[in-house]
């Protein structure tokens, strides 16, 4: 689904008219294709499509007219069918998405206008392969001009890839996978010593140690074949998931004890439902690893919306907030939570937005930035947005569109003068115009 054109389009590979497409992190796929091309003559390069198809390079997609060789493949409804029928679209999305949750996904095929899109499954790097990336001689400098995020990135390090949170609006697991691939402590320390500490401007602070979710480091699935769950921790914790926060604790303790290191911060955010499982982790987090502010993502307060988002119950956020504040007081810290909320997510009504607005008002939270949900390819939330259907249950979902999107976003920032008219109009539509002064004061 293409949000900008508001229509279902063919695979990007068809529209780009390329021979093949490489998706995700894809280091293995890229190396395989590069090695294959290097071995060919110029004339043979004209036949690369069939060569790539024969070798089934991971993280790669091709177009072909013949699929009989892919006996075990998952064949989806055709492009023509999903473009014409929203329920078919939702059903095909569910099949595609759940297949991608497996440890060993099948080849996925979609017929399209007399040809076939063939997508070869991803293959995660092993730990040693992942660590080898950080040994490569990257310059660690911008090619030209200033990059605003660079001041943060150059003094940060990546501890792992993958995320099993399963948030409906996020595509990270589609790119990096659901299963965590982490680096060893030795690999991370070596990078810090040899590549970060030697950079000009380094003052002893590591600004972030993390990945998509910092406190998923070292958490593994004990089930060899994996499963098709979208999330390992929602709506409940999977019994096959190793839930300990000990790997994160040990990593952070070791790094902050390195000579020349003053502080080690977590800047990439954590899952608070995981953090609450370990009192020692919470204690260490507040005492040593918050740089004044900690990013956290409750996203909403209404359970109906959180269910569709794949986020923990709001009571978990309140529990975390209470514990965070008590630990700050205990250790004499003045540190703050920066909560992220999304407006206009599928399933969110104006009533839901108003409840969130009054929660923020009651707790004296003034949001400087609000994300108005924007559909992005490959996510369950985008499927809901386009079809109005929850692909996992088949039930209809309210989808905020048009002016309602502006209303929902404005309700979360009623203090802004530019939003006054929108807030007034939204309240009038709800039959609650008398609340305008109370909300905007």
Stretches found by the model and what they are:
Residues 1-40, 46-112:
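Glycine-rich beta-alpha loop elements in corrinoid/cobalamin-binding modules
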Residues 193-338, 343-346:
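Conserved SAM/AdoMet-binding glycine-rich loop
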Residues 19, 188, 296, 370, ...:
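Conserved, mostly hydrophobic/aromatic
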Residues 12-24, 412-441:
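Amphipathic alpha-helical packing elements
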Residues 54-83, 97, 122, 180-232, ...:
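Terminal amphipathic helices with adjacent charged low-complexity linkers/tails
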Residues 280-281, 345-361:
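Catalytic cores of alpha/beta
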Residues 94-156:
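N-terminal [4Fe-4S]-dependent radical SAM core
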Residues 146-171, 203-208:
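N-terminal pre-triad scaffold of radical SAM enzymes
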């Amino acid at each position: 689904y293409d949000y900008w054109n508001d229509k279902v389009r063919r695979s990007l590979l068809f529209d780009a008219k390329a021979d093949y497409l490489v998706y995700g992190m894809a280091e293995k796929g890229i190396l395989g294709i590069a090695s294959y091309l290097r071995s060919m003559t110029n004339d043979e390069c004209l036949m690369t499509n069939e060569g790539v198809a024969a070798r089934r390079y991971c993280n790669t997609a091709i177009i072909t007219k013949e699929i009989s060789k892919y006996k075990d493949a998952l064949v989806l409804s055709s492009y023509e069918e999903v473009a014409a029928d929203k329920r078919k679209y939702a059903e095909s999305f569910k099949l595609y998405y759940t297949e991608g949750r497996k440890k060993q996904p099948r080849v996925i095929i979609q017929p399209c206008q007399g040809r076939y899109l063939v997508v070869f499954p991803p293959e995660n790097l092993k730990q040693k392969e992942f660590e080898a990336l950080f040994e490569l001689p990257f310059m660690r400098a911008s090619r030209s001009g200033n990059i605003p995020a660079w001041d943060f990135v150059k003094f940060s390090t990546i501890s792992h890839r993958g995320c099993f949170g399963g948030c409906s609006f996020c595509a990270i697991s589609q790119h990096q996978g659901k299963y965590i691939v982490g680096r060893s402590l030795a690999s991370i320390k070596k990078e810090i010593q040899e590549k970060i500490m030697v950079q000009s401007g380094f003052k002893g602070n590591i600004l972030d140690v993390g990945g998509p979710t910092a406190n998923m480091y070292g958490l593994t699935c004990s089930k060899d074949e994996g499963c098709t769950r979208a999330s390992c921790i929602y709506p409940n914790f999977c019994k096959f998931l190793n839930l300990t926060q000990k790997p994160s604790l040990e990593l952070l303790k070791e790094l902050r004890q390195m000579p020349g290191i003053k502080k080690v911060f977590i800047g990439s955010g954590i899952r608070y439902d995981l953090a609450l499982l370990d009192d020692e982790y919470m204690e260490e987090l507040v005492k040593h690893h918050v740089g004044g502010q900690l990013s956290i993502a409750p996203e909403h307060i209404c359970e109906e919306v959180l269910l569709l988002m794949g986020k923990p119950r709001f009571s978990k956020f309140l529990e975390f907030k209470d514990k965070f504040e008590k630990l700050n007081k205990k250790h004499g810290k003045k540190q703050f939570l920066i909560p992220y909320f999304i407006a206009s997510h599928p399933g969110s009504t104006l009533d839901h937005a108003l409840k969130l607005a009054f929660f923020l008002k009651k707790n004296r939270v003034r949001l400087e930035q609000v994300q108005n949900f924007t559909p992005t390819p490959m996510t369950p939330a985008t499927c809901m947005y386009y079809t109005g259907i929850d692909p996992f249950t088949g039930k209809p979902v309210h989808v905020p569109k048009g002016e309602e999107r502006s209303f929902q976003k404005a309700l979360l920032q009623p203090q802004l003068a530019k939003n006054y008219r929108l807030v007034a109009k939204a309240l009038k539509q709800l039959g609650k115009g008398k609340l305008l002064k109370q909300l905007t004061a």
